[in-house]
């Protein structure tokens, strides 16, 4: 798989750009702040419908405009597929697949498969659990686009149940059986959708675990063994062995957990049980990585998580596009060599760099210079092949 054409309109610092790309390696080169990362961000948005840098879409729209357009033509086993995404301010986003408007944005997920390596990846190890949950959900969605609907359904139920809990906490309606019956309905829905999301995550972690261990040893030979596991907000024994076929068990456990913690949830007005509170645990040896790993170990583990994702996508039968956003500048020589070795086998690698010396020696790559110029609407990014 590779991206043959890539176009932007009013995305971040770009008023417009059209790039013809080829298999192999392309380096987007230029000083920091010129808009290189914005290119990678747009490609990642085409993969996951989300940015790796911000949690909302509004910052993606160039200042002074009302919408951004991201267009890609993806070639997969000789067949082309065009994706056009319209990111709008004040109304719903829209997507086209092969120029035809689709009913929902999620229909384009999975057309472009990519793995992103970025400086923000350090948060996978050192940051909040939400970063690690998002890593799992993004990968699960790229591999199985139907998971996007599962996530959306769960998030919707979670918002509605949380709103009900807050109203109950404020109004103290606990003696109103009708209101409590309504909460029972939302408990059932949360358990149903939550079990489906948990099952997908647990199955994914079981597949990722051996790949993470291998990738970490490649990056840090002789170091402590890296391991990952899924820790639920419920006390489920042997959860590492729970797969998608155990959805009924997970649903029953979620319902039991919601019942047990109902009084506390009513007191606090928040939902305390469900996959939105689960954790992907990362360990080096017998210690948790967060708080105990060195800076170098943390980087190695973060890259190992991305390499593991890359290997799973390859095993699915489609070679993913590798997106490397200034990561060589963050790594020491040994880790650079290890990552470069993996990248050499990829069908397409798109790299950003502010310094030529950060790119591995001997790489045969097309270089594209990214610069800034003045326009009537302010400074905008441009490319010089």
Curated annotation (Swiss-Prot):
Domain of life where this protein originates: Bacteria
Molecular function via GO: ATP binding; single-stranded DNA binding
UniProt subcellular location: Cytoplasm
Binding site for ATP: 30-37
GO cellular component, one term: cytoplasm
Keyword Cytoplasm among record annotations: yes
Keywords for this protein: ATP-binding, Cytoplasm, DNA damage, DNA repair, DNA replication, DNA-binding, Nucleotide-binding, SOS response
Protein name: DNA replication and repair protein RecF
GO biological process, one term: double-strand break repair
Family statement: Belongs to the RecF family.
InterPro entries given in the database record: DNA-binding_RecF, DNA-binding_RecF_CS, P-loop_NTPase, RecF/RecN/SMC_N, RecF_2
Function recorded in the entry: The RecF protein is involved in DNA metabolism; it is required for DNA replication and normal SOS inducibility. RecF binds preferentially to single-stranded, linear DNA. It also seems to bind ATP.
Keyword Nuclease among record annotations: no
Native organism: Mycobacterium leprae (strain TN)
PROSITE patterns referenced in this protein's UniProt entry, alphabetically: RECF_1 (PS00617), RECF_2 (PS00618)
């Amino acid at each position: 798989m590779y991206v043959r054409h890539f176009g932007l309109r009013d995305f971040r610092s770009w008023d417009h750009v059209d790039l013809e790309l080829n298999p192999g390696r392309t380096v987007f080169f230029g000083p920091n702040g010129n808009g290189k990362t914005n290119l990678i961000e747009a490609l990642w948005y085409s993969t996951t419908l989300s940015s790796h840098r911000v949690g909302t879409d509004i910052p993606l729209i160039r200042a002074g405009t009302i919408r951004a357009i991201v267009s890609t033509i993806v070639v997969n086993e000789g067949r082309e597929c065009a994706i056009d995404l319209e990111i709008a301010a004040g109304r719903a986003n829209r997507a086209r697949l092969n120029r035809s408007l689709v009913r929902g944005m999620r229909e384009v997920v999975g057309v472009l498969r990519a793995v992103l390596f970025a400086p923000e990846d350090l948060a996978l190890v050192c940051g909040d659990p939400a970063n690690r949950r998002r890593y799992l959900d993004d990968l699960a969605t790229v591999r199985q686009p139907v998971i996007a609907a599962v996530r959306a359904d769960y998030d919707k139920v979670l918002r509605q149940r949380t709103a009900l809990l807050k109203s109950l906490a404020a109004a103290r309606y606990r003696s109103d059986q009708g209101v409590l019956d309504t909460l029972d309905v939302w408990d059932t829905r949360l358990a149903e959708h939550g079990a489906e999301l948990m099952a997908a995550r647990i199955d994914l972690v079981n597949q990722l675990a051996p790949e993470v261990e291998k990738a970490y040893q490649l990056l840090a030979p002789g170091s402590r063994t890296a391991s990952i596991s899924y820790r639920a907000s419920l006390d489920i024994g042997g959860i590492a062995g729970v797969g998608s076929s155990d959805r009924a068990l997970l649903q029953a456990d979620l319902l039991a957990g919601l019942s047990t913690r109902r009084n506390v949830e009513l007191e606090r007005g928040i939902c305390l049980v469900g996959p939105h509170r689960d954790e992907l645990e990362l360990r080096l040896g017998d210690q948790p990585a967060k708080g105990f790993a060195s800076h170098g170990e943390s980087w190695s583990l973060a890259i190992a998580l991305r390499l593991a994702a890359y290997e799973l996508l390859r095993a699915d039968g489609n070679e993913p596009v590798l997106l490397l956003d200034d990561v060589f500048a963050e790594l020491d020589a040994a880790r650079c060599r290890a990552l470069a070795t993996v990248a050499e086998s990829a069908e397409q690698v798109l790299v950003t760099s502010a310094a030529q010396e950060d790119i591995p020696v001997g790489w045969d790559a097309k270089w594209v210079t990214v610069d800034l110029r003045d326009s009537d609407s302010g400074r905008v990014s441009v490319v010089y092949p």
